């Protein structure tokens, strides 16, 4: 049996897709097989028609949503549906809405198109929408697909690139039997209905060569217990947060570079906490880079797998009461892992890394770096010795989070 990959199929260029978006046409956007592995019908919100909504409802069969930028959502007073988002991919739903005027029940194709046009109208205010309703707005991450490789961000990015309001419409594509359509079926769907199709990875690549969300502020010499490094200070243009890159030797674009992307862990990295293996992994990575003679360690300010220091300490207390690290996060209302690797990928690319040998036990990090012009040629495990304080933690990472320990 021959397994077809994304490279087997013919996709349209982003320029052609943007051209269709600008003309008010529907396109198909697919994501990676390691993520949702789905295709969505996508169009610009300000170009929506009742016919387009009817097409999505009849042929897409998924949930019709209206992705918008955070700025637009704030202008319209669109509050998040829940305070703590536990959805597996953290799709940022707001409270559902209908247009305040010009609709009846709110569910017809005409009514939903009217609501979406109100969302896209730059003159609309919170008074122009009624809550709850039959259209589901989604908040896109600032920075779009360069921050989060999701359909929400792709829809808003494509609308903006087409010179339109930062608002879109999307609907998942399902089979007749209600199961998700995958890439081979999406290609047949595309052919049947004459639609253009692109991948989120190609959109990331398109934006990456035209935009940059990190900027280098300073480089200093950094002597360490593991030899001399050059310390690069980067600032995120999205939130002003600073991240670091420790670089040893010369980066050669034509040779694989040994790379570690390490998320900050104050308790483990600084205080030597034995509740986790973060400090051990940090020092093991620096040691391996020193032995290699060339490599990069990117230090991301993402404490507690992204939930922050205070929440991590509260999670520790729940772990003392018998919960594991995943259960503790869930009890606090957080997913098991909130980290965002897009900025780390941009830092690596800015440093000149193209191919890399990845020091990680976490397969999700590999997925998080894909689509940014980086090619992983080898996953290099980091071995951590269990102790009585972190044995349960390491077993949870292996059994529930897929870490290769």
Which sequence ranges carry the predicted segments?
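Catalytic domains of riboflavin
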Residues: 1-405
């Amino acid at each position: 049996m021959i397994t077809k990959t994304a490279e087997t199929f013919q996709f349209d260029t982003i320029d052609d897709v943007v051209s269709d978006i600008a003309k008010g046409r529907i396109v198909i956007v697919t994501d990676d097989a390691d993520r949702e592995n789905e295709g969505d019908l996508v169009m610009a919100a300000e170009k929506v028609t009742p016919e387009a909504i009817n097409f999505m409802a009849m042929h897409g069969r998924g949930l019709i949503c209206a992705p918008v930028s955070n700025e637009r959502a704030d202008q319209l007073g669109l509050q998040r549906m829940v305070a703590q988002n536990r959805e597996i991919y953290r799709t940022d739903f707001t409270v559902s809405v209908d247009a305040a005027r010009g609709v009846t029940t709110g569910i017809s194709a005409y009514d939903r198109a009217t609501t979406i046009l109100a969302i896209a109208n730059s003159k609309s205010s919170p008074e122009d929408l009624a809550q709850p309703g039959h259209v589901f707005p989604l908040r896109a991450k600032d920075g779009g697909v360069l921050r989060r490789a999701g359909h929400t961000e792709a829809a808003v990015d494509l609308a903006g690139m087409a010179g339109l309001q930062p608002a879109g419409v999307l609907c998942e594509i399902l089979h007749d039997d209600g199961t998700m359509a995958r890439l081979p079926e999406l290609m047949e769907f595309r052919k049947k209905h004459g639609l253009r199709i692109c991948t989120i990875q190609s959109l990331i690549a398109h934006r990456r060569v035209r935009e940059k969300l990190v900027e280098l502020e300073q480089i200093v010499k950094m002597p360490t217990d593991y030899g001399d490094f050059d310390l690069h200070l980067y600032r995120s243009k999205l939130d002003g947060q600073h991240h670091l890159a420790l670089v040893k030797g010369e980066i050669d674009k034509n040779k694989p570079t040994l790379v570690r992307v390490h998320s900050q862990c104050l308790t483990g990295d600084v205080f030597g906490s034995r509740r986790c293996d973060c400090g051990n992994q940090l020092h093991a990575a620096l040691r391996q880079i020193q032995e290699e003679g060339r490599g990069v360690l990117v230090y991301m300010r993402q404490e507690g797998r992204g939930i922050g220091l205070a929440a991590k300490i509260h999670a520790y207390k729940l772990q003392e009461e018998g919960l594991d690290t995943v259960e503790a996060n869930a009890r606090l209302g957080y997913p098991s892992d909130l980290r965002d690797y897009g900025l780390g990928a941009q830092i690596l690319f800015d440093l000149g890394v193209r191919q890399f040998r990845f020091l990680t036990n976490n397969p999700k990090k590999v997925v998080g770096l894909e689509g940014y012009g980086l090619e992983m040629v080898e996953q290099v495990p980091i071995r951590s010795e269990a102790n009585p304080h972190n044995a349960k933690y390491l077993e949870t990472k292996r059994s529930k989070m897929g870490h290769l320990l």
